[in-house]
From Swiss-Prot:
Part of the ABC transporter complex CysAWTP involved in sulfate/thiosulfate import. Responsible for energy coupling to the transport system. GO terms for cellular component: ATP-binding cassette (ABC) transporter complex. This is Sulfate/thiosulfate import ATP-binding protein CysA. Keywords: ATP-binding, Cell inner membrane, Cell membrane, Membrane, Nucleotide-binding, Sulfate transport, Translocase, Transport. It is found in: Cell inner membrane. It is a peripheral membrane protein. It catalyses: sulfate(out) + ATP + H2O = sulfate(in) + ADP + phosphate + H(+); thiosulfate(out) + ATP + H2O = thiosulfate(in) + ADP + phosphate + H(+). One of its GO terms (molecular function) is ATP binding. Its EC number is 7.3.2.3. Gene3D superfamilies: P-loop containing nucleotide triphosphate hydrolases.
Length: 364
């Protein structure tokens, strides 16, 4: 079941929370709405579900306009962050609930409901807990029950509002893998809200990054990481180093050092340079690729690589976070050399260098 979101606007009083949002979601795709608090992601999810109504614009499911349909008529499954299980019902009865309250003409027989719920219990690996009550379950088990309940009515669209937000880190990782496997098996169209970058990129086919009621970028997870469309996406998607400097002529100046850009930008003046830890060239020896001296102030071994915090020596004031491959862990106080690869230059929100990779090499 495809979803078409066409020019959706939403305001609460004088506060505009969604600004002309348009997005097409193909049938069978799993999409993450990713953004900080206040970005509009949960409001958009609730509008898709029919739990909120847009101020203007349209929602279409497989070409049919559902903008004015009540939530129960849209036939979507919805999973809340805090499970919303019925405390007085067993696991079995919670999952069966959506089937038992269907109109009589649509309601399966008791035998069919039992068969369906038993299948779902096996699918979510909770058959042995069918007779327990929610208070007797762990957080991860409760979320599986909530998901099974949403799937019981066989929705063609599944919506999830921060489904793993209330769980501890290890359980979140396990459920993310499980949800992805379930999606591969059942091929339902799914949209979920999260503020967790790792969760979005691990689970989703496509990540929609939102900020202040706007879509900043809608793309495959690896492209959101490697080719951020805006400065907001670049900074929001994870740890990034920022250096302030100045463009003069065809050179980038920081402190007493300058590097050739390989071109002369139309803009001249103060800029911010961004690059992720793994985009920094790092070596124990100085070279054309790694000419800048730094000193290790923190070293955190991560197995096949080490995450370092290094202090530039004489050429910049703030520490940088970098990644060094291999098992030979640098020691605190050790002197290394870095080069700034794949750097991006911005003046405010405006990117000022070509979109191909920029390498800041040997000091001029």
């Amino acid at each position: 079941m495809s979803i078409e979101i066409a020019r959706i606007k939403k305001s609460f009083g004088r506060t505009q929370v969604l600004n002309d949002i348009s997005l097409d979601i193909p049938s069978g795709q799993m999409v993450a709405l990713l953004g900080p608090s206040g970005s509009g992601k949960t409001t958009l999810l609730r509008i898709i579900a029919g739990l909120e109504h847009q101020s203007s614009g349209h929602i279409r499911f497989h070409g049919t306009d559902v903008s004015r349909l009540h939530a129960r008529e849209r036939k979507v499954g919805f999973v809340f962050q805090h499970y919303a299980l019925f405390r007085h019902m067993t696991v079995f009865d919670n999952i069966a609930f959506g089937l038992t309250v269907l109109p009589r003409r649509d309601r399966p027989t008791a035998a069919a409901i039992k068969t369906k719920v038993t299948q779902l219990l096996e699918m979510v690996q909770l058959a042995h807990l069918a007779d327990r009550f929610p208070a007797q379950l762990s957080g991860g088990q409760k979320q599986r029950v909530a998901l099974a309940r949403a799937l019981a009515v066989e929705p063609q669209i599944l919506l999830l509002d921060e489904p793993f937000g209330a769980l501890d880190a290890q359980v979140r990782k396990e459920l993310r893998r499980w949800l992805r496997q379930l999606h591969e098996e059942l091929k339902f169209t799914s949209v979920f809200v999260t503020h967790d970058q790792e969760e979005a990129t691990e689970v989703a086919d496509r990540v929609v990054v939102m900020s202040q009621g706007n879509i900043e970028q809608a793309d495959a997870p690896d492209r959101v990481w490697r080719e951020p469309a805006t400065r907001f996406v670049l900074e929001f998607m994870g740890e990034v180093n920022r250096l302030t400097g100045t463009v003069r002529g065809g050179q980038f100046h920081v402190g007493a050092h300058r590097w050739p850009l390989g071109y002369t930008p139309a803009y001249q003046g103060p800029v911010d340079l961004f690059l992720r830890p793994w985009e920094v060239d790092i070596s124990r020896r100085t070279s054309l690729d790694s000419p800048l001296p730094v000193q290790v102030i923190e070293a955190s071994p991560k197995g096949h690589y080490t995450q370092l915090v290094v202090q530039p020596l004489g050429w910049y004031h703030d520490p940088l976070t970098v990644v060094m491959a291999g098992d030979d862990v640098p020691q605190r106080g050790e002197r290394l050399f870095v080069g700034l690869q794949n750097a991006r230059l911005y003046h405010g929100d405006q990117r000022i260098e070509p979109h191909e990779a920029l390498a800041l090499a040997e000091s001029a």
